[in-house]
C-alpha cells in the first residue's frame, strides 16, 4: 500500500536553524515517518525518491508554515466538561470542587465523549501529543479501556498516566489535620479512596499498564502519582522502581501553591518535597514535574542537575491564584522546560499558543526586571522538543527531521487569526 505524502513548498520551522526566517522546503512522509526534508522532493529523480513509487498524495504547502506538532505536556481529560465552570479560586478550594473525587462515578459513554471532546480541541489547536494524567475514580480497568479506545478513535498521540493518590488533598493542606481527624478528611474531599482499603493501588496500575503496552502505536504510558505528598512515603521508592523497570516516565505535581510549600516545610525531610523525592530515588530524566511555582533556586538547580523535566502551566496557575513560576531562574540553571495547558476547569482552553504567550510575557513583569524574559523561540522549543523529552518521546516527535514521526501542523499564513 502506497501511503506516501508529499508536502511541497512549505516554510519549515527549524528551531536549530533560522527560526525567524524559515526556509522553504518539501517534506516527504512515508508510513507516518518523515523520510526527507529539503527542496526538489517533487522531482521523481531526486535521490530521496530512489526506488519509491510516486506519492499517493501531494499537498500544496506554499501558503503554510510547517511546525512540529505541539506537545501538551500536562493535561487532565477528566474535567473537560467543566470548562468555564469556575471563577478564580485558590488551588486548595478548587481541588474540592473540580476533580473526580468531588462528583459521582461517571457513565462510560460520558468518559468516551469527554475524551473525544478534549482530544478534538487539542488537535484543532495544533496539539498532536497529550500527556493525560487522567483520574478514573474508583479505579476500574473497564473505564480505563473506554478512555484509551476514545484516544484511538481520535487519532491523537497520548502518553497516558493513571492519576492516583493515597491520601486526600485535605491531608496536605497545612494544619487542617489539627482541626479535622484524618479519618474524616476523605468525606471533606467528596469520595472514598480510589482503591479498596488494603488494596495495593500501585500494583494494580502497573499490571494495567503492562497489559496494555504496545497495543496501539499512538498510546504509551507513564505513572501519575498526584503529588509526592499525596502518596504514602513508602510508595515513592516503589514508584521509582516501577518507572525504571518499565522504562516509563513519572508525571506528578510539584510546589503548585504556597500551601504545598508550607506543608513541605513542616512535614518533609529537610523541609523540601524535592529532598523527599531524592531520598526515594525519583530524581532523574524520567521525572516530569508540573507547575513548580514555588521552588527555591537551590531546588531548581538540583532538579536541573538531575535532568528532571519542569512543565509550566502559566495560564492555569493564574486562575487557581497559585502565582507565576520562576522562569528566569529555571532558564539560568539550564532546566529542561516544557509547557502544558492543565485542567480544562482551570485553564478553560487547551491552547498552547496562549501558554506560549504567557511563558514569554509573565516573566517580563516578574522576577528581576533587568533580566530579559524568554524569547518566542524558547517558547516554541518548550512546546515541542521540550515537551517530547518530558513525556518520554524525545527523538520521536518534537522536530521536523528525517526519522521523526510525522506529527506536523500546517499553519495557514493567509489566515489573519
Question: Language-model segments: which ranges?
Answer:
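Alpha-helical scaffold segments that flank or form the walls of functional sites
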Residues: 83-157, 200-216
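Divalent metal-coordination and catalytic microenvironments
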Residues: 10, 27, 32, 63, ...
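His/Asp/Glu-enriched, well-ordered alpha-helical/loop segment
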Residues: 279-286, 328-415
